[in-house]
Amino acid sequence: LTFDNGPSKYTSSLIEQLKKREIPVTFFVLGENVEKFPDTLKFAYDTGNEIGIHSYTHKLFTKLKEEEIYEQIEKTNTILNNLIDKVPTLIRVPYGTRDEKIDKILSNVHLTDVLWSVDSKDWKLKNTNRIYQYVMKYIKGNDIILMHDTFKTSVEAAILIVDKLLSECYTFVTISEYIDTKEYVENISDITTLK
């Protein structure tokens, strides 16, 4: 289970509910929102959730110049490093859109891009029950579910989805566990070596 675009005013409530259920998730965060909700980001990390990069401002990378993409990544890395003393190795590129230029940049900064297999369409549906029904229709197991912790309806639907899947004996893991990779590096210079 993954969440993009946060943290937001709804994220702490989501974390509390997930903590009660002992469910770890991966948050792909926007640097500009981490600046607005630093305590929420720290709470997410401290409660065993994984933090990945989404970008700083959610701009479409394919429309940016190379140096602008590096800036989106580096700025977010610096913010996260200052808060949790670590730098993520995972990124979800905004809109999931990549090209050769982006692949090269991600390789240069040692980031693994993570897409999804089930898009909850929560950004479009904006109704708790419709989001829940939509995800349950497409879930097969071993899925990476994309949700957004920036909508109250998404957070409510996420808890319904978690409870239903737990009742069906599903297990939840972070992305780094799922793809068997290291989730963080200790030194920011290890990941931001340019070109």
Walk through the language-model features, giving the residues of each.
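Conserved, mostly hydrophobic/aromatic
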Residues: 4, 18, 51-54, 76, ...
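C-terminal domain-boundary segment and adjacent tail
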Residues: 20-21, 34-35, 153-195
